[in-house]
């Protein structure tokens, strides 16, 4: 039994699916050293995808040498002291809802200025939280589980606050995986159905 027509049909079906590739989006939140934005909200973009940040007071870019072993670079608040960081009782909310339409495979967050004894708190709108300690200072920490919970509840709001001491937001990084277009999936399905029919005919001959 010659199987080359079957193999050819299979190759055609697979060729209908575009090659998938991962994409990485990175948002860095300190682009200007020690400057207030003069507003409590701003949208940051990476490859055309926007994340909106809203502070409890005006946003502040901080960029200076480390203190107490902690990095002092990131997005903070203009109020209420000279540190210009997120203090207890203050917060910055990131809106990640623009990512819900993508096939997200990983989300990491980097906080800065977390000295010994200080903590940062990252929560969704449904009381699921991740705590950052001094060992996480200026390091990417996965919050993919938190993002999954946010997407499940259809709320993209992520609140960054200080548990103790004060913190800064350094970076958000997201990886996504391409999803085949619906038309490509239909073509693949049609090809596989045809392949199955050919196999049945060959076996019945």
State each model region's role.
Residues 5-8, 15-23, 170-193:
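Short, threonine-centered small-residue motifs that mark membrane-proximal processing/anchoring sites
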Residues 22-89:
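N-terminal targeting leaders for non-cytosolic proteins
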Residues 99-108:
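Extended extracellular/luminal ectodomain segments enriched in beta-structured repeat modules
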Residues 104, 114-117:
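Short proline/glycine-enriched turn/loop motifs at strand-loop junctions of beta-rich domains
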Residues 111-115, 162:
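Non-cytosolic beta-sheet module surface loops
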Residues 116-128:
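Short, surface-exposed beta-strand/strand-loop-strand elements in extracellular ectodomains
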Residues 129-178:
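Terminal, low-complexity interaction segments
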Residues 196-205:
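C-terminal membrane-anchoring or membrane-association module
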């Amino acid at each position: 039994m010659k199987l080359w027509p079957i193999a050819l049909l299979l190759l055609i079906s697979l060729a209908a699916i575009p090659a998938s590739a991962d994409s990485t989006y990175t948002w860095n939140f300190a682009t200007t050293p020690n400057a207030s934005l003069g507003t409590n909200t701003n949208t940051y973009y990476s490859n055309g995808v926007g994340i909106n940040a809203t502070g409890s007071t005006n946003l502040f870019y901080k960029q200076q040498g480390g203190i107490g072993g902690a990095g002092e670079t990131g997005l903070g608040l203009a109020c209420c002291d000279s540190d210009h960081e997120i203090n207890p009782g203050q917060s910055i909310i990131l809106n990640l809802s623009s990512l819900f339409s993508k096939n997200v495979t990983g989300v990491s967050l980097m906080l800065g200025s977390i000295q010994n004894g200080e903590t940062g708190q990252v929560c969704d709108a449904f009381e699921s939280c991740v705590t950052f300690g001094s060992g996480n200072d200026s390091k990417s920490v996965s919050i993919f589980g938190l993002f999954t919970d946010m997407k499940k509840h259809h709320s993209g709001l992520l609140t960054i606050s200080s548990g103790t001491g004060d913190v800064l937001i350094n970076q958000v990084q997201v990886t996504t995986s391409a999803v085949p277009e619906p038309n490509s999936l239909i073509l693949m399905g049609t090809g596989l159905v045809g392949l199955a029919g050919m196999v049945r005919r060959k076996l019945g001959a």
